[in-house]
């Protein structure tokens, strides 16, 4: 379950709201981004995010150490911290 958000884009998409942040996000990715956020919200264990394989669940390194991600596409990711069966600091970021 998503406990906290790290940016307005992720919060706006999961709530299906039209905000400044969601309007700036590529329109062709809004549905996929929301779907990935809902997968994250429904997950009770980190391993739940391994399916579908297109999620490409990863543990991040470097400045993102302590975070995991699932992919929306090659450029955009849902990034989050996982603890106690919940997701924290959930963000959608341009990873490149």
Q: What is each PLM-predicted segment?
A:
Residues 1-37:
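Arg/Lys-rich, positively charged N-terminal/basic patches that mediate binding to nucleic acids
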Residues 3, 30-33, 49-53, 65, ...:
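Generic structural signal for well-ordered secondary structure
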Residues 44-68:
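A short, surface-exposed loop/turn module that caps and links secondary-structure elements
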Residues 8-9, 20, 44, 52-55, ...:
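Residue-level signal for pocket-adjacent positions within structured domains
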Residues 40:
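Conserved phosphate-interacting/catalytic interface
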């Amino acid at each position: 379950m998503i406990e906290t958000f790290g940016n307005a884009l992720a919060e706006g998409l999961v709530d299906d709201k039209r905000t400044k942040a969601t309007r700036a996000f590529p329109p062709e990715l809004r549905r996929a981004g929301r779907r990935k956020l809902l997968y994250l919200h429904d997950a009770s264990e980190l391993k739940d995010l391994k399916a579908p394989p297109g999620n490409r669940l990863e543990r991040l390194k470097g400045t993102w150490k302590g975070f995991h991600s699932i992919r929306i596409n090659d450029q955009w990711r849902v990034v989050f911290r996982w603890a106690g069966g919940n997701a924290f600091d959930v963000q959608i970021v341009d990873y490149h």
